[in-house]
UniProtKB/Swiss-Prot annotation:
Organism of origin: Homo sapiens (Human)
UniProt-recorded name of the protein: Rho GTPase-activating protein 42
Gene Ontology CC: cytoplasm
Occurrences of domain Rho-GAP (ranges): 376-572
Composition-biased stretches (Low complexity): 620-650
Sequence ranges assigned to domain BAR in this UniProt record: 7-262
PANTHER family in the cross-refs: OLIGOPHRENIN 1, RHO GTPASE-ACTIVATING PROTEIN 42
Protein task: May influence blood pressure by functioning as a GTPase-activating protein for RHOA in vascular smooth muscle.
Composition bias, Polar residues: 667-686, 700-711, 749-762
Pfam families, alphabetized: BAR_3, PH, RhoGAP, SH3_9
Basic and acidic residues compositional bias, start-end: 687-697
Site (Arginine finger): 417
Amino acid sequence: MGLPTLEFSDSYLDSPDFRERLQCHEIELERTNKFIKELIKDGSLLIGALRNLSMAVQKFSQSLQDFQFECIGDAETDDEISIAQSLKEFARLLIAVEEERRRLIQNANDVLIAPLEKFRKEQIGAAKDGKKKFDKESEKYYSILEKHLNLSAKKKESHLQEADTQIDREHQNFYEASLEYVFKIQEVQEKKKFEFVEPLLSFLQGLFTFYHEGYELAQEFAPYKQQLQFNLQNTRNNFESTRQEVERLMQRMKSANQDYRPPSQWTMEGYLYVQEKRPLGFTWIKHYCTYDKGSKTFTMSVSEMKSSGKMNGLVTSSPEMFKLKSCIRRKTDSIDKRFCFDIEVVERHGIITLQAFSEANRKLWLEAMDGKEPIYTLPAIISKKEEMYLNEAGFNFVRKCIQAVETRGITILGLYRIGGVNSKVQKLMNTTFSPKSPPDIDIDIELWDNKTITSGLKNYLRCLAEPLMTYKLHKDFIIAVKSDDQNYRVEAVHALVHKLPEKNREMLDILIKHLVKVSLHSQQNLMTVSNLGVIFGPTLMRAQEETVAAMMNIKFQNIVVEILIEHYEKIFHTAPDPSIPLPQPQSRSGSRRTRAICLSTGSRKPRGRYTPCLAEPDSDSYSSSPDSTPMGSIESLSSHSSEQNSTTKSASCQPREKSGGIPWIATPSSSNGQKSLGLWTTSPESSSREDATKTDAESDCQSVASVTSPGDVSPPIDLVKKEPYGLSGLKRASASSLRSISAAEGNKSYSGSIQSLTSVGSKETPKASPNPDLPPKMCRRLRLDTASSNGYQRPGSVVAAKAQLFENVGSPKPVSSGRQAKAMYSCKAEHSHELSFPQGAIFSNVYPSVEPGWLKATYEGKTGLVPENYVVFL
């Protein structure tokens, strides 16, 4: 129930009811006053908490800014560089958010605290002053009235008239005070409605402005976030592949002889105890010793472990160097210590007595120093596999396997990822490579299933006496893909492939051509270029020595295979540029990180720090929005190239050829716009470096589930890659273990983790294009003039780089104006500014369009856009 109304006429009567109603208003004003005091106190605490939060976030961002990633190896992949740079990018993003919070905190006192305090003091305070005046006048009036009424009627008339005049004057003063008090109370009650609420509204507006700015930053940050997810997924894939290889190496080291000595620059090295004379006998001091047989140089340095704060607790002294004269095993009965031997050196008189750790270790030292002990063969760490050779039988076997796969199983899910049964694979190998088998033996595809054939093909390549890409060129390939210049990577790999022996290059040509075809069906088999690189990288480029350092280079081996697949036509069907210098060993440099993808260089305009999309809403393409992108990566980016992920409205993209004759693969688009995605996670495993008795059934085989989603919709995903790399439309979703995860419909949140890849799916496996020979038409055209419509693209930002990327997409050769061209495929226009034409149509006045991948041409008197890869110039 509301407050009672105060009438001015009631002030004249000053009835008990009036006083009661007046008291209700006074109680309400007092309650409001206390509430405002508490609100000001709580608001001050809130502002203080915001200030403390801001300081904590700034300190957190500074910690991110100061930390420096270091990776194993002498070079870093593009993914590793992006990840290393990400902490600084996170710090810059947090700083941008805190800048907005700082403005909120600065304005909060003026917007919230000061107006509330002013209202409390000026308005409610004025009402209190009015009450004091009213009470004073009331008390004075009724006191004088009481005295006036007590006057005797016998008083003089003049005295009575004076008393009447005084009482009238006091009553008038009381009446005016009462009216003013009533007016002020009602004024405060009315002003309370806006002067009290307006500061709160202003504060909330500022708070929501801060939140909205955070939302805008999140929107603008989305492209970088998505690319970083791709980088993280690639790195996770490489880790899974490398970890398995390192684990195998570790297990072999465990099972090897305890005194196994790995290859090094020294003939022999290790710890030895050296007998040193003391005034009261002898003492044995541990030294780290090395010996070079060529120069007969023996060095030893004191090495002792201390539980101090020094690194590793190891204290070493400067090494002493000697030239060895002789080495003799110490007789057992001549010393009470075991495993001893004596050496003579030029620099000292007498002998130096050394103690090895074991009898086998002493034999190794004696053998290295040409001692009198018999020479023992160094233990082998790895049992040699039965070797295969690049002979006629091998070429026939590979061709037959590829023919069988391409005939019946190229679209099978997890092709080459899921291994066959071990016994069947061994039977296939024994049958094919038996000494009694003819070189051109056929493979009965009815007898052998697809998994057995693919595992047999990989097993043959693993068991070659020398890997297909040779030990000699192994380091050169690795150095080539470690280059900062992505164009040079391709050119260097191109040149190195042509340095391979003829048979090796021929076999590599056959295999890579097949892998290109496999990757073109990645929509069905999910074997993208990235996945194939993970599988065949270690197989085609295994290192001569299995060391942890070699395992760390597996990620670069994968990149080599990706380059071979993506640039197959150029590498195998064109001669390399003789002016391209071959790779030279490089020392590790930190300069690449300064050129890493970074979004926060340069000054920032409001809401322009990250450009969230590259086209206007009414254009034919849209950038991926956070609403349609779960936390998991949609596709796996190749670590040696920069790619763009975008979505399309068109549902009728047809295949078409891009430069190099490699078709694109476009994902069917959604028909109703529902956000329905099938999510799948990957845990890729390396499928190489297995023992002869072990196949992919043990190392690679994972459970495979269909990729599903709640509806029959399939939001389109398309990747556009920067030239001169071909195979631009290949999807790079990495998968060794595939499992379906339900995705929520509509605006429900997705449950994928950041380590999970997301894949577009429907209730049924996506069907291939009706005519697989047709290359897909460019599903999206970006208007370059709208590329920066949503924000300022700073130099060096990933969005600016991606905008430039779209400017470079297309044929690497410039198209001259006014030429004629012929249509290789038919095409039906999807927009009014496109041309429809049949196969064989002749176009005139053909010249480049401002939209990448499209040409402007005239056909039958009509001028419009045609897909660049649908035509050939006459």
